[in-house]
């Protein structure tokens, strides 16, 4: 079973693909979708949608998992994050792929064992759990952690 994990952002959306075979988790690939700062919001959202669609057609995931939004003090950044998530979710919906979302503290707990873990701790555990030797960004590790959380969550029924 292939799971695509997504760490949404208007600037740098992290993505990570893992495969699950029984209790074995295998790292397949990961990366970051970067948008151009001078582009309009519509172009940025269109680029994110297009790249997510390319990932879906390339990896054919059984399930897509995404980090939930948390509203912070900066209202405008929260709104743009919600818009990026909407663009991503519309692509997932068009392909009718099984979908789940997880709060950041639930993801941290699944990976590190503590909901208040630091980003570098999540990154280290993702690399350790998935036997990743190369350098990965925090956006990639967050996306891979989200995919991993989906793999251990009861919402995914392995057939």
Swiss-Prot record:
Matching Gene3D superfamilies: Ribonuclease H-like superfamily/Ribonuclease H
Residues of the active site: 7, 67, 139
Annotated binding of Mg(2+) 2, by residue: 67
Essential cofactor(s): Mg(2+)
Cysteine pairings via disulfide bonds: none
Keywords: Cytoplasm, DNA damage, DNA recombination, DNA repair, DNA-binding, Endonuclease, Hydrolase, Magnesium, Metal-binding, Nuclease
Cofactor: binding details: Binds 2 Mg(2+) ion per subunit.
Catalytic activity: Endonucleolytic cleavage at a junction such as a reciprocal single-stranded crossover between two homologous DNA duplexes (Holliday junction)
GO term, biological process aspect, one: DNA recombination
One Pfam family linked to the record: RuvC
Compartments, as annotated in UniProt: Cytoplasm
Major subcellular site: cytoplasm
EC class of the enzyme, as a word: hydrolase
A Gene Ontology term for the protein's cellular component: cytoplasm
GO function term, MF aspect, one: magnesium ion binding
Taxonomy, superkingdom: Bacteria
Binding-site residues, Mg(2+) 1: 7, 139
InterPro entries for the chain: RNaseH-like_sf, RNaseH_sf, X-over_junc_endoDNase_RuvC
Enzyme Commission number: 3.1.21.10
UniProt subunit comment: Homodimer which binds Holliday junction (HJ) DNA. The HJ becomes 2-fold symmetrical on binding to RuvC with unstacked arms; it has a different conformation from HJ DNA in complex with RuvA. In the full resolvosome a probable DNA-RuvA(4)-RuvB(12)-RuvC(2) complex forms which resolves the HJ.
Family recorded in the similarity comment: Belongs to the RuvC family.
Functional summary from the UniProt entry: The RuvA-RuvB-RuvC complex processes Holliday junction (HJ) DNA during genetic recombination and DNA repair. Endonuclease that resolves HJ intermediates. Cleaves cruciform DNA by making single-stranded nicks across the HJ at symmetrical positions within the homologous arms, yielding a 5'-phosphate and a 3'-hydroxyl group; requires a central core of homology in the junction. The consensus cleavage sequence is 5'-(A/T)TT(C/G)-3'. Cleavage occurs on the 3'-side of the TT dinucleotide at the point of strand exchange.
Name of the protein in its database record: Crossover junction endodeoxyribonuclease RuvC
Gene source species: Orientia tsutsugamushi (strain Ikeda)
Gene name, Swiss-Prot/TrEMBL: ruvC
């Amino acid at each position: 079973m292939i799971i695509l994990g997504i760490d949404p952002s208007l600037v740098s959306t992290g993505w990570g693909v893992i495969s699950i075979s029984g209790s074995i988790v295998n790292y397949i690939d990961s990366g970051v979708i970067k948008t151009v700062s001078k582009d309009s919001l519509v172009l940025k959202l269109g680029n994110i949608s297009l790249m997510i669609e390319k990932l879906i057609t390339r990896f054919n995931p059984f399930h897509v998992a995404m980090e939930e939004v948390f509203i912070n003090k900066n209202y405008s950044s929260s709104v743009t994050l919600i818009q990026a998530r909407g663009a991503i979710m519309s692509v997932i919906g068009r392909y009718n792929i099984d979908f789940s979302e997880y709060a950041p503290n639930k993801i941290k707990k699944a990976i590190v064992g503590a909901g208040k873990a630091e980003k570098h701790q999540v990154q280290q555990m993702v690399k350790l759990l998935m036997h990743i030797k190369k350098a990965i960004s925090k956006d990639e590790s967050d996306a891979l952690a989200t995919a991993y959380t989906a793999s251990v969550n009861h919402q995914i029924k392995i057939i």
